[in-house]
C-alpha cells in the first residue's frame, strides 16, 4: 500500500497516525488527507525526477491547487497555483494562472510559449 485517503480534520491527525510508523499525513482539503510513507511527498518525488534526469530546480514547473501540492511547488523553479487553489497555496506559489475549469495549465503553457497551437 502506497497511500490511503481518509476523510478527516486536522485535529484528528495525531489519532489517525497513532500506532503507525514511518508515515505522514498530507492534507489536500480541510476535510480530507492522504496517509503516505514518511519522506515520500510530491516534493521528494519532484527532486527524485530532477536528479534522475540531471535537471536543475530552475528547469522545472509544477502546477497545484491543494495543500498537498505546496512542497511540490516549492521544489521547482516556478510553482504555479491554479486560479481555484486555496489561498495558502496561492501565497506560496510564484505565479497564479487560470482555474482548472478555465484550462489554466494549457493557457499558462501557451502564454509562456511552452507549447504551440
Regions found by a protein language model. Give the residues of each.
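Hydrophobic/aromatic beta-strand patches that form the interior of the parallel beta-sheet core
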Residues: 61-63, 80, 97
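Asp-based, Mg2+/Mn2+-dependent phosphohydrolase catalytic module
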Residues: 75, 83-117
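Conserved acidic, metal-coordinating active-site core of Asp-based
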Residues: 1-75, 84
Amino acid at each position: 500500500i502506497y497511500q490511503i485517503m481518509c476523510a478527516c480534520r486536522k485535529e484528528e491527525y495525531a489519532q489517525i497516525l497513532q500506532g503507525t510508523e514511518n508515515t505522514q499525513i498530507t492534507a489536500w482539503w480541510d476535510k480530507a488527507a492522504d496517509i503516505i510513507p514518511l519522506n515520500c511527498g510530491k516534493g521528494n518525488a519532484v527532486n527524485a525526477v530532477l536528479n534522475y534526469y540531471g535537471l536543475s530546480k530552475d528547469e522545472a514547473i509544477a502546477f497545484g491547487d491543494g495543500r498537498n501540492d505546496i512542497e511540490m511547488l516549492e521544489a521547482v523553479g516556478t510553482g504555479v497555483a491554479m486560479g481555484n487553489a486555496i489561498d495558502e497555496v496561492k501565497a506560496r506559489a510564484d505565479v497564479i494562472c487560470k482555474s482548472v475549469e478555465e484550462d489554466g495549465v494549457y493557457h499558462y503553457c501557451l502564454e509562456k510559449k511552452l507549447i504551440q497551437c
